[in-house]
Amino acid sequence: FEMNHLLTTAHIRQDFITGNYKPDPGNKFPINERGHPRYITSNTMVDKTVNHLLCDEVLTPSISKYLIYDNGASQKGKGVAFHRRRFEARLHQYFTQNGTNEGYILLVDFSGYYANIPHDKCLEVLQTFLEREVEDPETLAITEMLLPLIFKTFEQDVSRFTDKEIEAMMAGKIDPMLNYGVDPALLTGEKMLRKGVDIGSQPSQNIGIVYPYRLDNYAKIVKAVKGYGRYTDDSYAIARTREELLELLDGLEKEAKEYGLIINRKKARIVKLSSEFRHLQVCYSLTETGRIIRKINPKNITRERRKLKAYKRLLDSGRIDYATVENAFKSWLGSHWKYMSHDQVYNMSSLYYELFGRRPKWKKGHGRLHWLMAHPSTASTSMGTTTSAPPPSPRPPSPVSSPCPFFHFG
């Protein structure tokens, strides 16, 4: 693609002028993420180029002002680390304003989120934002032409099902692996399901962060829940009483149903802030002094230990090189060590050394992490936790918006 960049770009432009551009469905392959099978789509370089242009120049600017600040996924300057900082700031804010850790948190997510986004409703939402924000008529016309073509590649072949079964799929939850391993002879293209978006394409990221915006507005504006945030399909809300959160959950479920989304009531839970709860694979609890105790999910440790042993087998068989192993481990440890105890960091480092006979190296920085990896803990026991600094003491009756001046609250 790079060798013929200018020529390929000219061909793409010509296809747009003549109306002959049609995106390719791409290459779909399965992965297993924490025990959950998922279908990932890899687009062609031509389609990636078009998607980047569409999202960077049109979609992202059009939807950004309609997203709440605590919507932390797939946006420039945000991400998992940003969302976790905001989440902890919300916990501190609650303690500062109420002077106690006696409260509750609602943790909720959607069931089969990406696979169950209805195309017609989603296009309607995107169309609303585009008409408001895109001033250039030609840009708007091209975008309105392009989006249905992209959604066409998201459609799933359901030719082997009856009309009644397809109707049930549109009304209920469908399996994202619906066509995985199915005989190609059964996928005739006679019937297509207009539901679900591909994981792996850039337009899907924009869709994922904006489509449930009405639920965010319901929580923030209608119910006035300041301590609310969302990361793709994982949402949280903090309130003083369980009843407030139950009422919020019922309202969110009604809004979600209107948009064809399914809230997972089995996984939705309301727990005390003083007890241990998990959000984005980190366990938290708010103490009576306002400190936040953070702890890595033990399953993450177990999973990474198994991965290291699998990497060792692959390395011995010559299927991967050491640099791949080292980079994978450094990536994992670099994003998790702040939520691990001294013992956990040291034990993971020791296992790595035992398997590979050397320790991972960074070109610069990570001095504190290097020390934890090289020195065993002197404490007799370890809770496997780290704690964030406590917020300032509450000063009623003057409200304090946040103990962390870095953040603002909408």
Where are these regions (language model features)?
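Conserved polymerase palm-domain catalytic core
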Residues: 98-232, 237-247
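Right-hand nucleic-acid polymerase module
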Residues: 48, 52, 178-179, 184-194, ...
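Compositionally biased, intrinsically disordered low-complexity segments enriched in Pro/Arg/Gln/His
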Residues: 395-399
